[in-house]
């Protein structure tokens, strides 16, 4: 064991552990309506096999408590809180392919260091809110199990498959279920284990919530096709389950079965075992390699076969589970590394793909509240080092997921297996999320904007896949991130639709509301939204400089002095007999060539004209020339953008020329917006009493600027307007503030000087000049042009005005289904 590796993995895990590994008071798991329930909350889980946990916890041979604690921390951080653990091995140490040290040396004679290790393991798991499935027996040789009990009962020496062959081994251990003396030795062992009191906590095992369930054994089999043998096997399983329940009624009991494969291929036999009323849930195992679905040289090519067979195997067992309403746990599955390698760090492409598929089955079941409730992959190698010489485990080697009879690294998942670890982490997070009730804020009635005297009621719609008792918190903060208030509610959710309501009384402004569910002291986010309260009362004072009007008057005079030199280039491929398309070029402020796309009706007459101002960095899009046959449409490309952008040109326009108001990019861009009006009004077919404009984002800002600088626009419809309220804008959004501030710093400007320059181009300083009707659309969730900045400009408009809020929209307001119709209805008033 390398201490540095422990430290490194702990560093990775610490961020998660700080918030989620608080010591909570756990409770016993129970089954209700086919669901695992703990602390009144159902549990679908991803766990792992950690068979050697009790050995690591001991202070004797093989013990390594520092590693144990590091492994538990890592597993907890990865979201795996269910560990399947061997109580202890049986028989003397030193037997080939048997793990050591063992727990039970002879019937009723124990190596207490292993028991103390198990005590320590359970105590440490309890501290982390983790739970153990403890299996007591084993049908295989690697921990003694059946063969050792038969040897103690005088049935001959326990055989080793590697020495005598698989068939001979199976024949010998098939006697276990009919050997009364061997079974009685085991029943005595069960009594001793289940009745134990933990020496670390002083708590009887039967009262320890760190135990998820008792398990009869690892892959218990009857190894016999005859009806008498199978009946004896069923009797053994039922008797053991009843014995455990009589000793400990608090904990679940499970079989440890592989499913049909471990029941001589008989689903009815598996069903009979699990119909036992003392067996609380059903187990299956799946081994694509061991069962020859894939071989060493077909791990990749036969992966689809393995996945298909896996689904079939799961489904056929779930069909039986439905009859009894019992959960199913796939508590063992594994897949070899690529090219059948064993070394840490070798690729695991096929394993990762197989794991992803199996994990997806649990996620689907969790969402639906299904009976497929948990899985434990085999097995956790964690921080183990690998021997440079031993393929199979030898005393002194680190324990890993592969017991002594298997190649070390065959099925182990090590902490350094980054791709597999990422798959596991993604799965545990997805399953945890799937277990939560679905939540959304009900914003349809008022679009998330509350007006008038409060308090106002914010409703939340919840959909639960199962009955849940839960605590909820609603955290409200300003859009600047300042905490306002946290509201708490407890609720008993029924399966299906539910609702919560919170009464809010807030000052004018925009806010962030986040809904959390609280479990075991840990908050998990369910939903978030932005909200607005009386946005038309938001006060964002103008900061016009004394020469603001003079500056723009001079700019417009300078623009007027530039001959436009309009040039229309026909675009026949985008024209028809209804409207003709042209690429337009013209001169603007400073002699800069700008351009645009024009659609003009073919028929003679006077037509209304619509100017479209484009978003930041947008490309020109070509319309159907027949779409608006009675409309002139002109899409402006401002300087350096769209048609005017040079190959390889950076999109840093928002920061260009920031050192001086006369050189700042948007002085020219705003002049370009006015030049577009000049052009449209110059057309013979334009009805100059019906010239309108609209634009999105940057186009929204240009629409506002154009209307404030030129009264020839008769109505405008900006959406998600850009460039509003710079001082607040740069706090609320990272862009465009970051590049502008960086350019200002490079130019040696103070913040005060930067904001002074920007004030000449702040849309809120323009909108009081607008003389035409306005309709504005905003996205309530817009992170690029936050609603606060939209209303900073809107609230200075003095003419007829209205606004529309799309409560679920981010910045893409122009894609909202209702906005084109709303614009059309608005402009229809003035056509």
Task: Give each language-model segment a name.
Residues 26-293, 302-327, 333-353, 357, ...:
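Active-site mouth of glycoside hydrolases
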Residues 618-671, 728-737:
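Cap/lid segment of the alpha/beta-hydrolase catalytic domain
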Residues 598-600, 606-616:
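Short beta-strand element of the alpha/beta-hydrolase
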Residues 560-603:
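N-terminal cap/lid segment of alpha/beta-hydrolase-fold proteins
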Residues 770, 776-778:
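Short beta-strand/loop motif that positions the catalytic acidic residue
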Residues 379, 384-391, 791-831:
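C-terminal catalytic histidine-bearing segment of alpha/beta-hydrolase fold enzymes
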Residues 437-578:
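N-terminal targeting or regulatory segments adjacent to alpha/beta-hydrolase or S9 domains
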Residues 700, 704-749, 805:
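Hydrolase active-site cap/lid region
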